[in-house]
């Protein structure tokens, strides 16, 4: 199982240059999971970029990737709080995680699962990537 971050899903939906490669990597996973917090962040980003049609494409992609949305529990709240303390914007750390990033980090930490993301924020944390950096 791998944990999805908003960044990778937006790259796929936005047909960025590496979208096909990201899709291939994600579909190789037996299953994908996403924090409810990430799901909300992702839906808001998709809605603002592509409108209601974007949400239709998002739902189809998440079905294709066999994605399960997991509720945020107390352990994730603690892990997300610690992530923001150590790696958040304003901490001085190069990861500069934002609020939404902390949901993905917390779920990956609580499951001991790798995180599927795009960009250079999570590479500066202690979370294992689900793909080569």
Predicted ranges, named:
Residues 1-34, 47-60, 124:
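Short, well-structured N-terminal submotif of metal-dependent ribonuclease cores
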Residues 2, 30-33, 65-70, 114:
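Short loop->beta-strand "edge-of-pocket" segments that line small-molecule binding or catalytic clefts
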Residues 5, 101, 119-121:
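Acidic active-site catalytic centers that drive phospho-/nucleotidyl reactions
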Residues 23-24, 60-63, 85-91:
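Glycine/charged-rich beta-loop-alpha catalytic/anionic-binding loops adjacent to active sites
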Residues 43, 50-75:
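Active-site-proximal, substrate-binding regions of enzyme catalytic domains
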Residues 68-114:
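Active-site neighborhoods of divalent-metal-dependent phosphate/nucleic-acid chemistry enzymes
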Residues 105-133:
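Acidic, PIN/NYN-like endoribonuclease modules and their adjacent C-terminal/linker elements
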